[in-house]
């Protein structure tokens, strides 16, 4: 076996281990923080500070009975968790943890990630359809509608970063950030994070698993290891979204004094903690509100961000960076407030004032 294949195999094992360990940490951190937000201790029995609780839960899932409904399409039912999980793992192949520390430095890295991430929804639909359960199918159909609605503003928000760097390579995008793009693209970051949270079904966009409406959504009929794969997929998606946000907007691995990988992981944790804070703060939206927020609010803002970015590229050489950052932040708040005045997500159906 050549050195290339040995290095590839070693990196794949390390990457898979990183994702699994990160998911366990994310689960523990989310449960502890949500507990604090709700004035309760959270998991605190298994190990010090409840650190072993995710491992105990994982063991419990692995040893549970794997039940397949008698009316289910058994082949599709069995395949769905794999179709949903594998694309999420493939996304990490093009994400740089440090300069050149990635499985492959694709010159179309961000395009590859967007393409691969879209396959996950097929696995979710397979799970909902094959279960022969109306709640599962309803959750899957909600997923498709939500993914299609929010994919457009997500791609347009990333396009602003591509315009600034002139590259689709994730590695080159990080190297181009002398100033983190969150300062030059605050509106793009807002649109990206909002759309990404909808894509990975985090509160307030978690309609496909709305317990009070459709039980557990698309994986209502799943148990055992198959359910564990879906659970792992959801948190791995959040990890991927946080890593992409770090790469595109927060300067990736760049930072003073400490090792680049440390900075990259620290920024990922910062994004994830913000997502947890949003979950603890906001209630779940209705399906019509979610659709309206994507099409009537985020889509116009993402288009406005492209226009602003084009002006930045034209006039940036003549404007001080600090002034440009101030203008961008002011424009972002102005546009968000303007659109929030036009579109009201209050009682009844969403309407234009």
Curated annotation (Swiss-Prot):
In the bilayer, the protein is annotated as: Multi-pass membrane protein
Give the catalytic activity.
a quinone + NADH + 5 H(+)(in) = a quinol + NAD(+) + 4 H(+)(out)
One Gene Ontology BP term is: aerobic respiration
Protein location:
Cell membrane
List, alphabetically, the GO terms of the cellular component aspect: plasma membrane
User: Which InterPro entries has this protein been placed in?
Assistant: NADH_UbQ_OxRdtase_su1/FPO, NADH_UbQ_OxRdtase_su1_CS
Keywords carried by this UniProt record: Cell membrane, Membrane, NAD, Quinone, Translocase, Transmembrane, Transmembrane helix, Ubiquinone
Protein family membership: Belongs to the complex I subunit 1 family.
Subunit structure and binding partners: NDH-1 is composed of 14 different subunits. Subunits NuoA, H, J, K, L, M, N constitute the membrane sector of the complex.
Question: What's this chain's function?
Answer: NDH-1 shuttles electrons from NADH, via FMN and iron-sulfur (Fe-S) centers, to quinones in the respiratory chain. The immediate electron acceptor for the enzyme in this species is believed to be ubiquinone. Couples the redox reaction to proton translocation (for every two electrons transferred, four hydrogen ions are translocated across the cytoplasmic membrane), and thus conserves the redox energy in a proton gradient. This subunit may bind ubiquinone.
Protein name stated in the entry: NADH-quinone oxidoreductase subunit H
Record organism = Dehalococcoides mccartyi (strain CBDB1)
Question: Coding gene?
Answer: nuoH
């Amino acid at each position: 076996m050549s050195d290339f294949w040995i290095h590839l195999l070693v990196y794949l094992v390390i990457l898979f281990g990183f994702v699994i360990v990160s998911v366990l940490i994310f689960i523990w951190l989310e449960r502890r923080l949500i507990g604090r937000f709700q004035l309760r201790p959270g998991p605190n029995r298994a190990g010090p500070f409840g650190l072993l609780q995710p491992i105990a839960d994982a063991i419990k899932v692995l040893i549970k009975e794997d039940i397949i409904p008698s009316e289910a399409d058994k082949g599709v039912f069995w395949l769905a968790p794999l179709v949903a999980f594998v694309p999420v793992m493939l996304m990490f192949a093009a994400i740089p943890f440090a300069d050149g520390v990635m499985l492959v430095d694709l010159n179309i890295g961000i395009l590859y990630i967007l393409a691969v991430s879209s396959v996950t929804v097929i696995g979710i639909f397979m799970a909902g359809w094959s279960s022969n359960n109306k709640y599962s199918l309803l959750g899957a159909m909600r997923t498709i509608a939500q993914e299609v609605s929010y994919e457009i503003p997500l791609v347009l928000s990333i396009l602003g970063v591509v315009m600034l760097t002139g590259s689709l390579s994730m590695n080159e995008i990080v190297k181009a950030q002398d100033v983190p793009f969150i300062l030059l693209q605050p509106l793009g970051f807002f649109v990206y994070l909002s759309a990404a949270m909808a894509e990975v079904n985090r509160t307030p966009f978690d309609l496909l698993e709305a317990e009070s409406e459709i039980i557990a959504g698309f994986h209502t009929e799943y148990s055992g290891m198959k359910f564990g794969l879906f659970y792992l997929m959801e948190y791995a998606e959040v990890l991927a979204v946080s890593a992409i946000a770090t790469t595109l907007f927060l300067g990736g691995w760049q930072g003073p004094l400490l090792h680049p990988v440390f900075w990259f992981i620290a920024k990922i944790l910062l994004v994830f903690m913000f997502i947890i804070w949003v979950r603890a703060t906001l209630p779940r939206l209705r399906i019509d509100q979610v659709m309206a927020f994507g099409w009537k609010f985020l889509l116009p803002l993402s288009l406005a961000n492209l226009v602003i970015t084009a002006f930045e590229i034209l006039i940036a050489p003549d404007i001080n960076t600090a002034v440009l950052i101030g203008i961008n932040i002011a424009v972002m708040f102005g546009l968000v407030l303007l659109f929030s005045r036009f579109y009201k997500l209050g009682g009844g159906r969403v309407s234009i004032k």
